[in-house]
UniProtKB/Swiss-Prot annotation:
Annotated propeptide span(s): 305
Name under which the protein is recorded: Polyubiquitin-B
Lineage: Eukaryota, Metazoa, Chordata, Craniata, Vertebrata
Family label: Belongs to the ubiquitin family.
Any Pfam family matching the protein: ubiquitin
Glycyl lysine isopeptide (Gly-Lys) (interchain with K-? in acceptor proteins) cross-link, renumbered residues: G76
Domain of life: Eukaryota
Length: 305
């Protein structure tokens, strides 16, 4: 069959191929026609970079399909992938490679299917559609490879309009990961999402298992009012912390934000406003705490009551 290869200069090359040809074969044909070495070629189809060892039929490339040829920047780089067994894999990548591409390279080297791979960098699980540069992964960075437990689970997310979204997740997924999955499905930016479970707002850095969210649990999605506000928290040392909050945030949420900023565990925090100690389950609006209000933070004595 014939396929077309379009270059960034707008030139279109016609190739005679078979569905069983590998991407490597196709690059060799391009080299024969155009003189471009295969290791400088990147072929893109349907927005996806094609891996050498796969075939045209693997990517559902049919007659008269058009591939896009991008010249590989001579700024390819090496990164390392460390497995839980302690083995380190070296990969040749580019900043523009997607996480999906990286998983395909790992599959080529190690035989682990991409859907069983979870890649972690700087404590964050990497999402397939993002690129290495999105996560600021640079040359000689080390990613961590965790095998996905078979036993991923479904959860439901219910919106205020009554729509229910089904998500495939794992207990170890962070709330941040879940918001990214909702963005992929619904297009809602994570910073506009608030997720509620068992009456509690879920914090980005925590995992589903931290909140005991199990298979077929239902979370509630509330869109963040673009009326978030700033408040101040003053410590006994005189330091003032600025927090982004909403009137509907609970005192517990505020303590979690303080922990994220200052590292002080919530159970050691006492928050005072207008001479009154604030209770975890109440909200800022319950106490009439408004924008630019100042709370006072007192550290709870260990063993105090």
């Amino acid at each position: 069959m014939q396929i077309f290869v379009k270059t960034l200069t707008g030139k279109t090359i016609t190739l005679e191929v078979e569905p069983s040809d590998t991407i490597e074969n196709v690059k060799a044909k391009i080299q024969d026609k155009e003189g471009i070495p295969p290791d400088q070629q990147r072929l893109i189809f349907a927005g996806k970079q094609l891996e050498d060892g796969r075939t045209l039929s693997d990517y559902n490339i049919q007659k008269e399909s058009t591939l896009h040829l991008v010249l590989r920047m001579r700024g390819g780089m090496q990164i390392f992938v460390k497995t839980l067994t302690g083995k380190t894999i070296t990969l040749e990548v580019e900043p523009s490679d997607t996480i999906e591409n990286v998983k395909a390279k790992i599959q080529d080297k190690e035989g682990i299917p991409p859907d069983q791979q979870r890649l972690i960098f700087a404590g964050k699980q990497l999402e397939d559609g993002r690129t290495l540069s999105d996560y600021n992964i640079q040359k000689e960075s080390t990613l961590h490879l965790v095998l996905r437990l078979r036993g991923g689970m479904q959860i439901f997310v219910k919106t205020l309009t009554g729509k229910t979204i089904t998500l495939e997740v794992e207990p170890s997924d962070t709330i941040e990961n879940v918001k990214a999955k909702i963005q992929d499905k619904e297009g809602i930016p994570p910073d506009q999402q608030r997720l509620i479970f068992a009456g509690k707002q879920l914090e980005d850095g925590r995992t589903l298992s931290d909140y005991n969210i199990q298979k077929e649990s239902t979370l509630h999605l509330v869109l963040r009012l673009r009326g978030g506000m700033q408040i101040f928290v003053k410590t006994l040392t005189g330091k003032t912390i600025t927090l982004e909050v909403e009137p509907s945030d609970t005192i517990e949420n505020v303590k979690a934000k303080i922990q994220d900023k200052e590292g002080i565990p919530p159970d050691q925090q006492r928050l005072i406003f207008a001479g009154k100690q604030l209770e975890d389950g109440r909200t800022l609006s319950d106490y009439n705490i408004q924008k630019e209000s100042t709370l006072h933070l007192v550290l709870r004595l260990r063993g105090g009551c």
